[in-house]
Structure formats: C-alpha cells, structure tokens
C-alpha cells in the first residue's frame, strides 16, 4: 500500500485545460493527465530555471521527490508530443494549495 501524498505548494494553475494535435478532434485521441504538482515542477524547473533543491523547497517536498515529479511530468509531455496524444491539465475547480 503506497504512502499517502503529502500536500504540495502549487504556485499557479494553467490558463488552458488541454493541448492536442491540430486538426484531430480530441475525442478521437488518447489522453494523458498532467497533475497539478507535475505542472508546478515543470514551471519551477523549466520556466523559472530553479535548481532542483530550490524548486523542491518551494513545493515543500524533498529533492528526491521533486526529481521523481519532474521526471514523470517530462515523460508525459514527451509522450504527448511524440505520439500525438491529448495532454490534459489541472483545472480551476481543483483546490490550489496555499503556502503555510
């Protein structure tokens, strides 16, 4: 039985709900869901270009956990780009974690 997920600090939510290949209806394509913590890890590491330790501290997780999250996120994005799948993103109705 896996351990319960610890709360993570999420700095922002996306402005879009999904990305998909152009010209193909979304209902005809397989979907991969990007979790809120995975999107935040991508934002911190790739957009803000923070080191893993800084990004992990910002999210309230260990550096090892951050490394696992960013690896999972990059894998999902790469699969969607290479295999032409729909990438669904967390939406505004999900709870946004507040900084303590």
Curated annotation (Swiss-Prot):
- Tree of life domain: Bacteria
Name used for this protein in its record: UPF0251 protein VV2_0946
Q: Which residues form a coiled coil?
A: none
Supply the Pfam families for this chain: DUF134 (PF02001)
Q: Which organism is it from?
A: Vibrio vulnificus (strain CMCP6)
Cited HAMAP family: UPF0251
PANTHER family named among the record's database cross-references: PTHR37478, UPF0251 PROTEIN TK0562
Homology family: Belongs to the UPF0251 family.
């Amino acid at each position: 039985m896996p351990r319960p997920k610890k709360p993570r600090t999420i700095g922002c939510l996306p402005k879009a709900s999904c990305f998909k290949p152009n010209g193909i209806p979304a209902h005809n394509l397989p979907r991969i869901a990007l979790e809120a913590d995975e999107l935040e890890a991508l934002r911190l590491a790739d957009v803000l270009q923070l080191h893993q330790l800084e990004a992990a501290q910002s999210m309230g997780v260990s550096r090892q956990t951050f490394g696992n999250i960013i690896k999972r996120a990059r894998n999902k994005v790469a699969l969607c780009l290479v295999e032409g799948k729909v990438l669904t993103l967390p939406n505004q109705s999900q709870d946004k974690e507040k900084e303590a």
